[in-house]
Amino acid sequence: MTTQVPPSALLPLNPEQLARLQAATTDLTPTQLAWVSGYFWGVLNQQPAALAATPAPAAEMPGITIISASQTGNARRVAEALRDDLLAAKLNVKLVNAGDYKFKQIASEKLLIVVTSTQGEGEPPEEAVALHKFLFSKKAPKLENTAFAVFSLGDSSYEFFCQSGKDFDSKLAELGGERLLDRVDADVEYQAAASEWRARVVDALKSRAPVAAPSQSVATGAVNEIHTSPYSKDAPLVASLSVNQKITGRNSEKDVRHIEIDLGDSGLRYQPGDALGVWYQNDPALVKELVELLWLKGDEPVTVEGKTLPLNEALQWHFELTVNTANIVENYATLTRSETLLPLVGDKAKLQHYAATTPIVDMVRFSPAQLDAEALINLLRPLTPRLYSIASSQAEVENEVHVTVGVVRYDVEGRARAGGASSFLADRVEEEGEVRVFIEHNDNFRLPANPETPVIMIGPGTGIAPFRAFMQQRAADEAPGKNWLFFGNPHFTEDFLYQVEWQRYVKDGVLTRIDLAWSRDQKEKVYVQDKLREQGAELWRWINDGAHIYVCGDANRMAKDVEQALLEVIAEFGGMDIEAADEFLSELRVERRYQRDVY
């Protein structure tokens, strides 16, 4: 199958102009980027940039505030599209990241729109945690003069589907806010629901907010979105895989790969803290197994996004086969009248458990049925790209991007199963083979602007990836700030990822301290949170010296355990109770001194 990438000729800038723009903006702060956006708008309209960046007086019109709370970029894209719709309707709108929002201003909001995703076990995105805590605290103000709407993005394969949006919606109403529209909960395939919701929001707001004068129809407080590139999630770069190296030992229970991808002369840029989006193909053997279990041939024509494709091709390129969901189980049970699965229908907990423990192909194996090709396609979810924390800095690797991939492998009744994207990169892409990629920028996981600022990095397992990028950048910048790494894994001899590199950084004085937790090398299990408590006094000194704290890895257990350890350290060595420690950590988050990249 040939992947079509938009030719550069379609861009309004030639390659040289695009390169100059990228070079000029790559190290600007979000605030500076927002100002530059207003400046260019002012130049275009022959008005001073200051006017373009100044909100209209509140007395003249009630402004609309859109809060974007995004984890992987989808919520941000919906918020940006809504902002553009409202500007087209000549309404005065302000778009802001939840992490930049001064939440004490919420009492003065008249028209408030929240677009949010959900992470972990129903938690809000990292950039919205402080706002979420504030609204659920005793400090939250009454909002009787606020009308609001919430669009919630989620993944129905998780138990706490769209929980963050549900939280914001219920709390805003509880505080006295008036719902402009009922909340919308959108699944992975959110685009159609988002488009319909945006149109309804515009219609609802037209009757609430007077039309702005031309000079006032400008987005203020812009979300961090100015990343100039012809490549995106919907138009990925076709790059080539240059290195696929296993970096765990022969006897390790884990298969972790160091992957290097050659970006060629694409000009694709990224920063430490960003993620690499990977569009993968399903395993042809898995496709064949599923098709045969359903008594199909694979050459049946099916319709995908208005195009007719053979079933095998559609399944390999366009549909999710490695993640089951409660909805899929329920729909399959209803379609096939399976005696095994029908008793689960209506019991959310049992459906979730079955979906989490039984891949789609094994669900079909255990409850065989005959479906036609279109029925199968309608049962499945669209394939979505996987995001991997980038493990390199272009200050060192230039036109490459590195990722650290934990390959998902397991057995179901003796049959080997694997994760879709991780096995694609590890097993099915040959050297110099094509990989479709894009950069998902993450402005909520950034090194300090001041190179003298100390950095504390906590990243067990593959959570170490962005800190490799951080250290490459700090070394290239000759940053004088101290660096401290906490890393953990089961065994020292088998699972010390990038061991030689960390040892070199210590020897060269770039890595000031390193604390290692090997959970299976002794009778008593030791994790990174235990090392945090053990080093509590020194950790508190670093925090008092202005250190930034970064956490990367598992959201469900590790991140919570690490946060609890940090709270205990702050309470003990800061001489405060847990409630005060929680306030202290929340302040660090607001100040961007406590940042997490968890999944």
Curated annotation (Swiss-Prot):
One of its GO terms (biological process) is sulfate assimilation. Pfam families: FAD_binding_1 (PF00667), Flavodoxin_1 (PF00258), NAD_binding_1 (PF00175). It comes from Shigella boydii serotype 4 (strain Sb227). GO terms for molecular function: flavin adenine dinucleotide binding; FMN binding; sulfite reductase (NADPH) activity. Residues 234-448 form the FAD-binding FR-type domain. Belongs to the NADPH-dependent sulphite reductase flavoprotein subunit CysJ family. InterPro entries: CysJ (IPR010199), CysJ-like_FAD-binding (IPR003097), CysJ_Proteobact (IPR029758), FAD-bd_FR_type (IPR017927), Flavdoxin-like (IPR001094), Flavodoxin/NO_synth (IPR008254), Flavoprot_Pyr_Nucl_cyt_Rdtase (IPR001709), Flavoprotein-like_sf (IPR029039). Pathway: Sulfur metabolism; hydrogen sulfide biosynthesis; hydrogen sulfide from sulfite (NADPH route): step 1/1. Alpha(8)-beta(8). The alpha component is a flavoprotein, the beta component is a hemoprotein. GO terms for cellular component: cytosol. Its cofactor is FAD; FMN. Residues 64-202 form the Flavodoxin-like domain. This is Sulfite reductase [NADPH] flavoprotein alpha-component. CDD domains: SiR (cd06199). Binds 1 FAD per subunit. HAMAP family: CysJ. It catalyses: hydrogen sulfide + 3 NADP(+) + 3 H2O = sulfite + 3 NADPH + 4 H(+). Its EC number is 1.8.1.2. NADP(+) binds at residues 519-520, 525-529, 561. Component of the sulfite reductase complex that catalyzes the 6-electron reduction of sulfite to sulfide. This is one of several activities required for the biosynthesis of L-cysteine from sulfate. The flavoprotein component catalyzes the electron flow from NADPH -> FAD -> FMN to the hemoprotein component. NCBIfam families: cysJ, PRK06214.1, PRK10953.1. Keywords: Amino-acid biosynthesis, Cysteine biosynthesis, Electron transport, FAD, Flavoprotein, FMN, NADP, Oxidoreductase, Transport. FAD binds at residues 322, 356, 386-389, 404-406, 410, 419-422, 599. PROSITE patterns: FAD_FR, FLAVODOXIN_LIKE. FMN binds at residues 70-75, 117-120, 153-162.
